[in-house]
Amino acid sequence: MSEMTPREIVDELNRHIIGQDKAKRAVAVALRNRWRRMQLDDELRQEVTPKNILMIGPTGVGKTEIARRLAKLARAPFIKVEATKFTEVGYVGKEIESIIKDLTDVAVKQTREEMMQKVRYRAEEAAEERILDVLLPPAKTSSSGWAQQQEETPENDDQRGTRQVFRKKLREGQLDDKEIEIDLAMPQMGVEIMAPPGMEEMTSQLQNMFQNMGSDKTKARKMRIKDAYKQLVDEEAAKLLNPDDVKEAAIESVEQNGIVFLDEIDKICKRGDTSGPDVSREGVQRDLLPLVEGTTVNTKHGMIKTDHILFIASGAFQMSKPSDLIPELQGRLPIRVELEALTSGDFVRILTEPSASLTTQYHALLNTEGVEVSFTEEGIQRIAEVAFHVNETTENIGARRLHTVLERLMEEISFHATDHSGEKLVIDADYVNEHVGELSQDEDLSRFIL
């Protein structure tokens, strides 16, 4: 679980996302409150429930990007889902409870990786011994059943010395490219079972049964020592783990630190002109209520209580408004954050400030072909103006418009990059006007091309 302070979280988000300070502060405080709650005594900790967040803002302003970056910072079970994928229980489509099941799967994988890191040193030693046993097979047992090398003999000393020499070479990487034949555990069978809605539990049990068949079998494989070492370390680490301990820790992690990011929640708002049951809109909202309020979900790893899972919902709300959500769900999302539409100045910052900005990416990509691309301040300003103008005159898709404009701008040089190896290309305002200026002015063309 992340122990970063709200200020540190916001600073980290600022490296990748421009503006939207209110949203950053809200998620930073929510994430820090997870840590604060864990410092309380058990009795009070159970009473402190998370304050769920609803982020409102037009498309392309950073809602989903905040979720992506938050997932990396949280160091806790995190899942991002699209609200539009779900339907009411009993109808064709994914059930809402599958969110918690998927979150638990994420937690189990995360917990297993963390536990494997703790036993990695022992696993590396065991992997080393197995490789050395292949390179220098131990002495065979005699007819009496005792190893012939039990007694201290000069030959045994020589063998131990040789083993240490090979161990040193192995650790220094001198044997990486040598091929050996070694017994490795066979990979689990990948079985996909299709089942009707509502029978997911039976499906997962059948899949586990088929996957466990033959899981103890080994197969001799010939490969380089470098590749074999990686697989052996993972295999030995898995042997050192107790599956029950992994499940127990994962369930605790989900219940206490789990975060669900529910995107496109505005798409499940009920529209006024519809009549009859709305299984993919209001029905989904009703099914979502118990999860957000707190319920118990049965998963293949065990029972999961959702009382302390944090839900962050987001939506553009262009065709609807937050008040179109059913009142009970509105009450479960007490913190409202409105994200602002991006301006031309924001576009300039997006193109220059993030550590992996679009201009940096294009520079690095074309540099692999020997073409050095540089963007002038006037060129970047003009790209931002074109993107902003097209957003204003057609559909406003926010910062995603920069991808479209830049791809169109760089199309020619990207195609002919191999012919211009060793050359330098300066993207200034004139270059931008020449390649996308006219398109941005023609509304009909920009609607289809930009």
Curated annotation (Swiss-Prot):
The record's SMART domains line, in alphabetical order, gives: AAA, ClpB_D2-small
* GO CC terms of this entry: HslUV protease complex
What residues does ATP bind to? 18, 60-65, 263, 328, 400
Q: Write the record's keywords in alphabetical order, separated by commas.
A: ATP-binding, Chaperone, Cytoplasm, Nucleotide-binding
Cellular localization per UniProt: Cytoplasm
Q: Name one GO biological process term.
A: protein unfolding
Q: Which InterPro entries match?
A: AAA+_ATPase (IPR003593), ATP-dep_Clp_protease_ClpX (IPR050052), ATPase_AAA_core (IPR003959), Clp_ATPase_C (IPR019489), HslU (IPR004491), P-loop_NTPase (IPR027417)
Which stretches of sequence are listed as region Disordered? 140-162
Description of how the protein assembles with itself and partners: A double ring-shaped homohexamer of HslV is capped on each side by a ring-shaped HslU homohexamer. The assembly of the HslU/HslV complex is dependent on binding of ATP.
* Cross-referenced PANTHER family: ATP-DEPENDENT CLP PROTEASE ATP-BINDING SUBUNIT CLPX-LIKE, MITOCHONDRIAL-RELATED, ATP-DEPENDENT PROTEASE ATPASE SUBUNIT HSLU
This protein is called ATP-dependent protease ATPase subunit HslU
Tell me which species this is from. Answer: Idiomarina loihiensis (strain ATCC BAA-735 / DSM 15497 / L2-TR)
